[in-house]
């Protein structure tokens, strides 16, 4: 049985990607910013600071960093604190793993002000040994070093950790860093399913499938 897990949050444990996509499209449209269909794939591993820098520097969004943060914070907090649900079977599976003695850890691009309140509302926060935002490491999930730093903090060799994420770039980087990787289906990344399957050790469409991997 795999004993140590490192989970993504958005699109992996909770059904939040439609909220993120809707908000970013609203910001882009209001500011006449053109964007490709793959913008979610590009933005989600970056963290709030990285997203702001990318939008302002690369997409020429006419906002200051502070203005961007205020816009995002107000929109996101309301959704994460009150509305965003856990994905199907997530709560049950995480509780099962915890009862079996697994170490549950989380690494997400989301900031703590939305992450923590959402996890506590869903009853997930206390199941985890570590809950990290990329901000805690001052880097993003596209940098292999973040996975090495997380493994060091957990105190387990890289190859003994199963990383789970719905994002292709994060999965690819974690795999290159030396972790075992399980891709997770999400509607927002469904078009990249074949790509994700090609670079991961496992792939699940429903969270209940994780148990067969864990106990194999």
Segments the model singles out, each with a brief description of its role:
Residues 1-3, 95, 111-112, 116-216:
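Asp-based, Mg2+/Mn2+-dependent phosphohydrolase catalytic module
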Residues 1-41, 176:
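Active-site neighborhood of HAD-like aspartate-dependent phosphohydrolases
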Residues 13, 86, 104, 139, ...:
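Conserved SAM-binding loop
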Residues 21, 25, 48-53, 65, ...:
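An amphipathic alpha-helix signature
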Residues 27-28, 47-61, 118, 150-151:
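Helix-loop "lid/cap" segments that line or gate small-molecule binding pockets
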Residues 54-92:
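Metal-dependent phosphoesterase signature
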Residues 78-106, 112, 116:
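Short, acidic loop-to-helix structural element flanking the phosphoryl-transfer center
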């Amino acid at each position: 049985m795999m004993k140590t897990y490192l989970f993504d949050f958005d699109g992996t444990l909770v059904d939040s990607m439609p909220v993120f996509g809707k908000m970013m499209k609203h910001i882009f449209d209001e500011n006449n910013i053109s964007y490709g269909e793959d913008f979610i794939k590009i933005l989600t591993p970056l963290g709030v600071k990285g997203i702001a820098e990318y939008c302002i520097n690369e997409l020429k969004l006419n906002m200051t960093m502070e203005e961007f943060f205020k816009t995002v914070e107000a929109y996101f907090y309301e959704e994460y604190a009150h509305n965003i649900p856990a994905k199907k079977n997530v709560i049950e599976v995480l509780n099962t793993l915890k009862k079996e003695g697994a170490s549950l850890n989380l690494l997400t691009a989301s900031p703590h002000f939305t992450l923590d309140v959402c996890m506590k509302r869903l009853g997930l926060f206390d199941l985890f040994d570590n809950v990290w935002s990329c901000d805690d490491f001052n880097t993003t999930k596209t940098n292999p070093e973040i996975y090495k730093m997380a493994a060091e903090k957990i105190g387990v060799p890289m190859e003994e950790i199963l990383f789970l994420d719905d994002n292709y770039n994060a999965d690819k980087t974690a795999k290159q860093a030396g972790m075992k990787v399980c891709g997770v289906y999400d509607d927002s990344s469904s078009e990249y399913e074949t790509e994700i399957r090609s670079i991961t050790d496992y792939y699940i469409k429903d969270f209940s499938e994780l148990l067969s991997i864990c106990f194999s």
